[in-house]
A protein has these predicted regions:
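DNA-binding alpha-helical recognition surfaces that contact promoter or target DNA
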Residues: 86, 112, 142
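Short amphipathic alpha-helical interaction segments
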Residues: 104-119
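Short helix-coil-helix linker/hinge
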Residues: 74-82, 90-93, 109, 137
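Short, cationic-aromatic polyanion-contact patches
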Residues: 72-79, 128-150
């Protein structure tokens, strides 16, 4: 594999309004850029663009996905973990015992997933039927709702 020289690599640039683009091609007067939110490509004058140092073009590309959904995607590693989060969104607060009785997760796996979800801000501790449990946060609910309407 041959790496492109730094000047030919995709980079993040922004215009005067702060809108970020992926720089695809650059000539002496204009640059071909892509808006990561829309996928639309256009030529802009070089004097309208400024390089954004320290931001990976992959991070810029990921910005096309809303923050709640990105957070959900990074915290759920497989269908089981996604399913657990969807169930918490749909069922509301559930005690740890309810979760263990309802699903095919051992206690260690369940607590591991819930710890990851808590760290990501997707679940919070709650009480269900007088017992310690968990509930989905508004962030998780928005992300799941968005995925449901987009699919």
């Amino acid at each position: 594999l041959r790496r492109l020289p730094p000047s030919n690599r995709m980079r993040t640039v922004s215009d005067a309004d702060g809108t970020r683009y992926l720089l695809l091609k650059q000539s002496s007067e204009a640059s071909l850029v892509r808006d990561p939110r829309t996928g639309r490509e256009q030529y802009l004058d070089n004097d309208q663009l400024e390089s954004v140092d320290g931001e990976s073009p992959l991070v810029t590309a990921a910005s096309a996905v809303d923050a709640p959904v990105r957070r959900l995607l990074t915290a759920t590693h497989n269908d089981r973990s996604l399913g657990l989060l969807v169930e918490l969104v749909d069922r509301g607060p559930c005690s740890t015992i309810e979760l263990l009785d309802s699903y095919d997760l051992c206690e260690s796996d369940l607590h591991g997933l819930l710890a990851e979800f808590r760290a990501a801000g997707l679940v919070e501790e709650a009480t269900s039927h007088g017992e310690r449990g968990y509930d989905a946060t508004d962030l998780a609910t928005r992300a799941v709702d968005q995925l449901r309407t987009d699919s």
